[in-house]
């Protein structure tokens, strides 16, 4: 069996996976970075340290499950495909990927974390054919909230045109700050999602859009956080599942 090794060391997860296209098989190992209770993030130096500790462990676990041949290695090297987009935490994955590819004498490819999000979404949705056609993508995470027009690109897989972005908070930041108000561990997305699944109430929250130009709208998320803060102030953590 032959596969492709992927590595991602972003905030706040160490991730590695092997993809075998002939068998449509994905083996993955990932682990959240440890964030102290009550904290709303990590310094980049701490993130690099934890990635450096966790990545070898995950690669060992992945190797124990995959006994095949690695054809190539891919690694995330920046948050986005934009000038000046940089975070030190990606150096941990890049260093490991360079060493592995060099030792195995296989090709090494660099992609942005955002491209990885988009590719993973297409795979999960069963829309791999979209790699060959233009489509719209919404990247909603802790560090990015953007609407994109995505086109195929032979060199980078995707060419992205920014259509809209948040002006203040990113969606993930709002989620994590609300989670912090409720005393949930950081990052709070998974725990808030669990609480939401238990809720029988429905909330209709629409982002407010403001167009700088006809093709480049912007939207604010801070008002949504204020709404959630007000809600959080009226409930206890015990009853949080009834409101979120």
Report the location of each language-model feature.
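Activation-segment/catalytic-loop signature of the eukaryotic protein kinase fold
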Residues: 237-244
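Acidic, glycine-rich active-site loops and adjacent beta-strand->loop/helix elements
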Residues: 13, 76-81, 112-118, 144
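General beta-strand structural signal in soluble alpha/beta enzymes
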Residues: 7, 75, 108-113, 169
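Short glycine-rich, Thr/Ser-proximal phosphate-binding strand/loop in the N-terminal lobe
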Residues: 10-49, 156-162
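Short beta-strand-loop/turn "lid" adjacent to the catalytic site in phosphate-handling enzymes
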Residues: 60-97, 102
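Conserved phosphate-binding catalytic cores of ATP/NTP-utilizing and phosphoryl-transfer enzymes
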Residues: 1-2, 106-135
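Short, well-ordered amphipathic alpha-helical segments that serve as non-catalytic structural scaffolds
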Residues: 29-31, 50-65
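A short helix-loop
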Residues: 2, 9-10, 27-28, 129-133, ...
């Amino acid at each position: 069996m032959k596969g492709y090794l992927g590595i991602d060391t972003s905030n706040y997860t160490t991730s590695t996976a092997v993809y075998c296209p002939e068998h449509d098989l994905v083996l993955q190992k990932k682990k959240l970075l440890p964030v102290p209770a009550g904290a709303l993030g990590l310094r980049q130096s701490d993130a690099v340290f934890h990635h450096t500790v966790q990545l070898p462990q995950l690669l060992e676990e992945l190797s124990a499950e995959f006994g095949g041949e690695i054809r190539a290695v891919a690694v995330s090297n920046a948050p986005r495909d934009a000038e000046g987009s940089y975070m030190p935490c990606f150096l941990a994955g890049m260093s490991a990927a360079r060493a592995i590819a060099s030792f195995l004498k296989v090709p090494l490819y660099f992609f942005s974390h955002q491209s990885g999000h988009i590719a993973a979404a297409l795979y999960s949705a069963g829309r791999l054919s979209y790699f060959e056609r233009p489509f719209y993508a919404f990247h909603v995470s802790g560090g990015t909230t953007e609407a994109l027009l995505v086109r195929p690109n032979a060199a980078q897989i995707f060419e992205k045109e920014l259509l809209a972005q948040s002006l203040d908070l990113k969606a993930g930041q709002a989620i994590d700050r609300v989670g912090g108000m409720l005393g949930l561990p950081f990052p709070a997305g998974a725990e808030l999602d669990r609480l939401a699944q238990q809720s029988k109430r429905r909330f209709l929250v629409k982002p407010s859009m403001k167009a700088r130009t006809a093709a480049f709208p912007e939207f604010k998320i801070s008002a949504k956080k204020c709404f959630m803060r007000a809600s959080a102030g009226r409930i206890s953590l015990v009853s949080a599942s009834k409101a979120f």
